[in-house]
Amino acid sequence: MKNLRGLLLAFLVLSLGISDFLRAQDQQGFISLDCGLQADESPYTEPLTKLTFTSDADFIKSGKSGKIQNVPGMEYIKPYTVLRYFPDGVRNCYTLIVIQGTNYLIVAMFTYGNYDNLNTHPKFDLYLGPNIWTTVDLQRNVNGTRAEIIHIPRSTSLQICLVKTGTTTPLISALELRPLRNNTYIPQSGSLKTLFRVHLTDSKETVRYPEDVHDRLWSPFFMPEWRLLRTSLTVNTSDDNGYDIPEDVVVTAATPANVSSPLTISWNLETPDDLVYAYLHVAEIQSLRENDTREFNISAGQDVNYGPVSPDEFLVGTLFNTSPVKCEGGTCHLQLIKTPKSTLPPLLNAIEAFITVEFPQSETNANDVLAIKSIETSYGLSRISWQGDPCVPQQLLWDGLTCEYTNMSTPPRIHSLDLSSSELTGIIVPEIQNLTELKKLDFSNNNLTGGVPEFLAKMKSLLVINLSGNNLSGSVPQALLNKVKNGLKLNIQGNPNLCFSSSCNKKKNSIMLPVVASLASLAAIIAMIALLFVCIKRRSSSRKGPSPSQQSIETIKKRYTYAEVLAMTKKFERVLGKGGFGMVYHGYINGTEEVAVKLLSPSSAQGYKEFKTEVELLLRVYHTNLVSLVGYCDEKDHLALIYQYMVNGDLKKHFSGSSIISWVDRLNIAVDAASGLEYLHIGCKPLIVHRDVKSSNILLDDQLQAKLADFGLSRSFPIGDESHVSTLVAGTFGYLDHEYYQTNRLSEKSDVYSFGVVLLEIITNKPVIDHNRDMPHIAEWVKLMLTRGDISNIMDPKLQGVYDSGSAWKALELAMTCVNPSSLKRPNMSHVVHELKECLVSENNRTRDIDTSRSMDINLSFGTDVNPKAR
């Protein structure tokens, strides 16, 4: 008998016979990536399938684009005419955001098409996370092949990796994910790798989306030994079992031409030990006469029998084996056998067959993965090997890591991190402390600045720390020095500005590798302080607050004269705004660099103390989400702060005006502002509390990147274990933490409260205080609205419902947690940043799930010897 594969190769094109409006369906949850499509190309609707594809550039950080040549006798739809190939690295991985615990149909398409003019068809492995999924062999399937699996992700991140196994270059044409119902296609263990999916018909039509709402590909298959049944009546496919079989698949069926014979389908397996699941979809599509009976048993070998089965008239049902079957000799035989009392032969409309694929290797501990990826992002690392799972499989371990492996079912843990000689800049980032099993840290021979963070002493697992050859400064935390006495190996050689006491003026010999401050540098600093002290002392004694002679500003930033301030602002020609400090003017430095000049008003409620606080803070901190201080003026009665100019002004202005900020931009702004606060709380030593977080103190540049501003009320905590300080209450009404107001006890959680209020502004576009509401304060109003359970009445109506409801709910819940009356129940800013980034990922994923309509078949085969054949 003729093998089904030969027939499948003949049926290449899907006819388009139904009008578009009948075919229109929802692609909610679909991910359709055109691999190799240029990053700057917009998502497009494929003209034949009407499926919406987008570039894969945002989901992978490696690879190059290629375009296939024309293949005689083959026609490919647009997504399969370009590809991404991977000449560099062994493992190259896509990272997709998915819903944990959801059943997904995952499809990967591969077309070589001699894109490189080498006529060298590749062969490589395909992985899901740390486990092998299948081998892609384009040497055997020269016209292209399709890999398909039904899989339930264990986390919200799914990694699909192409792994080089020989000398040829891996490639991929398209990547597609389709959510399925969670009560369908459930094996006893593992995932289901598709062997074939066919509907029994003599037509040439392949059925997929939108007739199939899950975009399963149903290829036509029929043999001469069979008799075709067809109906023009409606077949009810709304079966309670949830398989959603398309009606086009079940309006035809096959029965044996010889009514006494069984209906038999056989297929070969690649490996004799494969375990098989078969799903039979049956519906009686004939109106049976009173004396007619159709009843049959199903046999899949000596030990597997099921029945009798009597298909329901014009109602589809799905039959499947609940336990996997092993086919003797690697050949499966499925028979539908007529029972003695049946007057009609057996009937079958469609069949799917799968083998189980076990994924025994656990992924690396989720917290370790999150931490190492945050470190990668913070330092802007771009290592070709840093793709996929950090620790497994072991032969693909990320460069610079070592991991601990217990067994395959236990998630590996990261035990050492070596980023020596990696051109790192910036501070030692706080995400390191989230590697809770880290034993060795090597950041030597980089250009790291800032201090040695206190959190290193709190990492109980750390045994070795190498920070030598950097530009670290300040004193080494005493707690860390105490751990050296208890066996910690600490190397800080080659950091000339690092010392071992808070005064940084003594040489200690009790440390492994002491650091000596340069006496010449110290003398220069003292001279600068003295000079500035003299200048400040000359200021008018009429100024309110502590005299300059009592409090000087230590700085290495540019100090401008008042005449220079007049020149850069053209005598204060253009006003940008007004704040508690005074007027803010636009200016230019050197005629090119735009700046904002904040001039202290003689009547300002803020005075020299807050001016000094802001200057000193901005001189010792740097973060991309904090406004940068360009310089200052301190000349007699003239005080001015000179900042980088932020083109789009403050966030509050955008909410009070007519401009509309999209939901994704709002989330980006929230992430930026939260990251700035996180740096103040964790990245600074001692930690800094802003004390005046509000929407008017969040400035936006030309790309809508947000930066925190106005640090005049900020407070540094003393070094030690204190969780709060007692201080006079300062801040802005509406944003002010009630607990801080009542107790005078300030902590970083006071900033968290204020940020929660800002986040509610971002979500609702409502004023913080509105006495026309039943609940004047925004947090109380939102709390009231939440009792009604309708988020649409809370979200800013300017958004017109264009947002991912999941991300909106998550952001709203986060904001309400931040404004909890009890500071103990509020999250820290690191948690806030993490949650907001997840909201952002969900929203970005939504923009790729665009509704489309019709579908067309692909023209690729399943591969060799995995398709059924009739007998």
From Swiss-Prot:
ATP binds at residues 576-584, 598. InterPro entries: Kinase-like_dom_sf, Leu-rich_rpt, LRR_dom_sf, Malectin-like_Carb-bd_dom, Prot_kinase_dom, Protein_kinase_ATP_BS, Ser/Thr_kinase_AS. The active site is at 692 (proton acceptor). Residues 537-871 are cytoplasmic. The modification Phosphoserine is found at residues 696, 726. It catalyses: L-seryl-[protein] + ATP = O-phospho-L-seryl-[protein] + ADP + H(+); L-threonyl-[protein] + ATP = O-phospho-L-threonyl-[protein] + ADP + H(+). Residues 25-515 are extracellular. Residues 1-24 form the signal peptide. Gene3D superfamilies: Phosphorylase Kinase, domain 1, Ribonuclease Inhibitor, Transferase(Phosphotransferase) domain 1. SMART domains: S_TKc. CDD domains: STKc_IRAK (cd14066). LRR repeats lie at residues 413-436, 437-459, 461-482. The modification Phosphothreonine is found at residues 561, 727, 732. The modification Phosphotyrosine is found at residues 643, 740. It is an enzyme of class 2 (transferase). The chain crosses the membrane at residues 516-536. Residues 570-837 form the Protein kinase domain. Belongs to the protein kinase superfamily. Ser/Thr protein kinase family. This is Probable LRR receptor-like serine/threonine-protein kinase At1g07560. It comes from Arabidopsis thaliana. The lineage of its organism: Eukaryota, Viridiplantae, Streptophyta, Embryophyta, Tracheophyta.
